[in-house]
């Protein structure tokens, strides 16, 4: 998941008094927060899921050890949260500045066959693609709204590249066919893309899960 800097400017209340900015959330709390969001959406804990679906004992054991594929892993926030609960994670990231990544490669080079060979079929896929060209602050530099389709057509080379990447990720998801998948992005332009239509979407805010920031996020 992309990291966002907290606004360094203190908050000015309506009475004119200056209050300090909210404290930064620790990495451990961030990991727990992301797992809580993920769990809420797909009705975790897994033991409850298993009971509700009336599966056999072998499947129960399999679901107690989920295989998670984390794309655009970065600091591995969601991966660490799953690992802390005993699940198996395979992370993919192109930037070698990030540590403890299973596969360093351009996502465009990654194939379903490669994932299956090296990791197996994932139960869950979590993808956090670049949000730059969809963010409210920068979208006018990268995209223009198509009046006929409503799509935010790319006008910059980087936006065109990002669209190819995102559609490649959707292809990977279709080929790997996980039980659950998540495409995480700050609430912005991605939800308006034609290739995102028909995909279930939840908008969550960090303050719903105990953080001081709102930070609306589409998953």
What are the roles of these predicted feature ranges?
Residues 2-3, 7, 12-17, 26-219:
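Conserved active-site and SAM-binding loop architecture
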């Amino acid at each position: 998941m992309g990291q966002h800097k907290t606004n360094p400017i203190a908050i000015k209340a309506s009475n004119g008094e200056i209050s300090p900015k909210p404290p930064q959330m620790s990495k451990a709390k961030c990991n727990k927060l992301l797992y809580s969001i993920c769990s809420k959406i797909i009705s975790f804990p897994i033991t409850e899921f298993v009971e509700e679906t009336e599966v056999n004992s072998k499947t129960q054991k399999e679901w107690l050890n989920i295989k998670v594929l984390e794309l655009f892993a970065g600091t591995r926030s969601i991966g660490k949260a799953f690992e802390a609960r005993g699940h198996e994670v395979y992370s993919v990231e192109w930037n070698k500045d990030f540590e403890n990544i299973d596969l360093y490669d351009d996502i465009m080079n990654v194939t379903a066959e490669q994932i299956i060979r090296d990791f197996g079929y994932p139960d869950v896929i979590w993808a956090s693609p670049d949000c730059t060209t969809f963010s409210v602050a920068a979208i006018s530099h990268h995209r223009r709204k198509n009046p006929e389709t409503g799509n935010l057509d790319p006008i910059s080379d980087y936006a065109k590249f990002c669209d190819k990447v995102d559609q490649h990720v959707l292809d990977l998801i279709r080929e790997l066919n996980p039980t659950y998948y998540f495409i995480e992005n700050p609430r912005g332009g991605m939800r308006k893309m034609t290739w995102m239509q028909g995909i279930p979407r939840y908008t969550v805010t960090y303050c719903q899960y105990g953080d001081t920031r709102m930070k609306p996020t589409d998953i």
